[in-house]
Amino acid sequence: MGLQAGTRQLHGNLILLPVAVVMLLLCTSPVCATASVGLPADCSRLTSSSPSGVYVIQPAQSPPRVVWCDMDTEGKGWTVVQRNTYSTEITWKESWTTYKYGFGNVQGDHWLGTEYLHLLTQQGTYKVRFVVRDKANVTHYAEYDIFRVESESSGYPLRLGRLLSSGKDYLTSYYSSYGGIHDNMKFSTVDKDQDQHSGNCASSYGGWWYDRCQNVLLNGKKYILWPEICPRVTACRPSSWSNPPMCADCARGWGSATIPSRSPSLPSPITATHTVRNQLQ
C-alpha cells in the first residue's frame, strides 16, 4: 500500500466518519521552550492526562495560536496541522496569503498556516504522521522522523527525513510515472507558482508542495491522492449514492488544526482525536 496499514478505527469521534480520512500530525523530539508563561510551545508540552481538544499554544517567535491537540494517538501530544474531510466547504484553492496565515476551523477542516508550520518546526526536531482512512474504514499512515518547513523568503520548502513506517515512500522518493517528488519542493498556490511543471499545479489542485504536480495530494476539495490507496483522481471523486457524498475509493481527508487571526482565551478542551506531543516526554 504506500502507507502502513494500521488499526481499523481512530480514537474519539473520527470513527463516526464513514469515509476516507486524511490527517497530518506533528510531534516534536527535543523539549521545546515555552514562548510565554502559561502557554505551551506545542501540544507535546501538555500533561499526559490532558484530553484531546482545542488548546492555545505559542511557538517561539509566534503569536498565540489555537490548535487541536490529539492526546489519543499513540505517544500523545500530537499537534494537528491539517484536516480535510469529504463534507468540507473549503476549496483549498486559496491565495498565498491565505495559506500563509491559515484558514478553516480547528474542530473541522483547516490548514494551520505555512508561516506557523515554519515557526512551529523551527523550535526543534519534529516528526510527522500522515494518516489516511480508506472507504473500508482501514487506517493507513506514513510517518517520517523529520518534518520541517523553511521560511517564506525561501518559498516554504518542505524538508522530510527518513520514512519510519512500512510501505512505499511517495514523498521523498522520485516517481517519474506520477508527479516526481515532494521533499525539498517549494510551496505553490494559485497566485504563486513555484512548482517544476510547465503549468500551475495549484490552480488545478490547491496549495501543496509540487514538483511536476503530485504523487500525493491531501489538499483537494473533491478528492485525495495517494498511490495504491487513492491512485486516480476519478477514483476519489464523490459519488451520489450516499448523503453526504462518499468517494468510490477514498472519500476525504483529515489533517491538522486551524488558527484564528486573533488569539482567544484558553477554551475548555473538547473531546476528539489527533494531537502533537514531545517525543521525550
UniProtKB/Swiss-Prot annotation:
<dbReference type="GO" id="GO:0005615">
    <property type="term" value="C:extracellular space"/>
</dbReference>
<feature type="signal peptide">
    <location>
        <begin position="1"/>
        <end position="33"/>
    </location>
</feature>
<dbReference type="InterPro" id="IPR036056">
    <property type="entry name" value="Fibrinogen-like_C"/>
</dbReference>
<keyword id="KW-0732">Signal</keyword>
<feature type="disulfide bond">
    <location>
        <begin position="43"/>
        <end position="69"/>
    </location>
</feature>
<feature type="compositionally biased region" description="Polar residues">
    <location>
        <begin position="270"/>
        <end position="281"/>
    </location>
</feature>
<dbReference type="InterPro" id="IPR050373">
    <property type="entry name" value="Fibrinogen_C-term_domain"/>
</dbReference>
<comment type="function">
    <text>Shows a cytidine deaminase activity on 2'-deoxycytidine (in vitro), however shows no RNA editing activity (in vitro).</text>
</comment>
<keyword id="KW-1015">Disulfide bond</keyword>
<dbReference type="InterPro" id="IPR014716">
    <property type="entry name" value="Fibrinogen_a/b/g_C_1"/>
</dbReference>
<dbReference type="Pfam" id="PF00147">
    <property type="entry name" value="Fibrinogen_C"/>
</dbReference>
<feature type="region of interest" description="Disordered">
    <location>
        <begin position="260"/>
        <end position="281"/>
    </location>
</feature>
<feature type="disulfide bond">
    <location>
        <begin position="201"/>
        <end position="213"/>
    </location>
</feature>
<feature type="compositionally biased region" description="Low complexity">
    <location>
        <begin position="260"/>
        <end position="269"/>
    </location>
</feature>
<dbReference type="GO" id="GO:0062023">
    <property type="term" value="C:collagen-containing extracellular matrix"/>
</dbReference>
<dbReference type="InterPro" id="IPR002181">
    <property type="entry name" value="Fibrinogen_a/b/g_C_dom"/>
</dbReference>
<protein>
    <recommendedName>
        <fullName>Fibrinogen-like protein 1-like protein</fullName>
    </recommendedName>
</protein>
<feature type="domain" description="Fibrinogen C-terminal">
    <location>
        <begin position="34"/>
        <end position="246"/>
    </location>
</feature>
<dbReference type="GO" id="GO:0004126">
    <property type="term" value="F:cytidine deaminase activity"/>
</dbReference>
